[in-house]
Amino acid sequence: IMAKEFPEMLVGAGTVLTTEQVDRAVNAGAKFIVSPGLNPTVVKYCVDKGIPVTPGTSNPSDVEMAISLGLDVVKFFPAEQAGGINMIKAMAAPYTNMKFMPTGGINASNLKSYLDFPKIIACGGSWMVKDALINGGEFEKIKEMTKEAVDIVK
């Protein structure tokens, strides 16, 4: 619905675990896929179909697998629990062409520390859009928290 209502918006799908979910997401208008882990079957499927994919990684072996599959961007998940920005910096050192998109534990207080590192292309965070806020129809609060995140990035 979002992709149809707002065609200028880049809409993707997250927590994609299977090729069937890839197909459903793309058919619903997703332009890119993000997954919590590196499933070679899902990555190859996306690459073969020309669908941008960002699989989750949390160690050098995952990064090397991503490189072998032709990727140069990975999700680092769960970021804070897996060592945060210091772990990303350590992993980025030998993999000079790799870029990272951390998610998991990112919030308004640590967002800038991630985005200040040049190897970070984006951060994901659910702190702005909690289920309770959505279910409660608290869209002004979501708007306020989203604006706060944008202001941090400026």
Regions found by a protein language model. Name each.
Residues 16-18, 38, 58, 79, ...:
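Active-site beta-loop-alpha junctions enriched in small/polar residues
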Residues 46-51, 132-154:
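C-terminal helical cap(s) of enzyme catalytic domains, especially alpha/beta-barrels
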Residues 18-28, 61-69, 92, 106-122:
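Catalytic cores of alpha/beta
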Residues 36-42, 75-85, 119-141:
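Glycine-rich phosphate-binding active-site loops on the catalytic face of alpha/beta enzymes
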Residues 22, 43, 63, 85-88, ...:
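Generic structural signal for well-ordered alpha-helices
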Residues 1-59:
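Glycine/small-residue-rich loop that forms an oxyanion/phosphate-binding "nest" at active or ligand-binding sites
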Residues 49, 60-74, 84-94:
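Anionic-ligand binding region
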Residues 11-14, 33-34, 53-56, 74-76, ...:
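Hydrophobic faces of well-ordered beta-strands that scaffold small-molecule active sites
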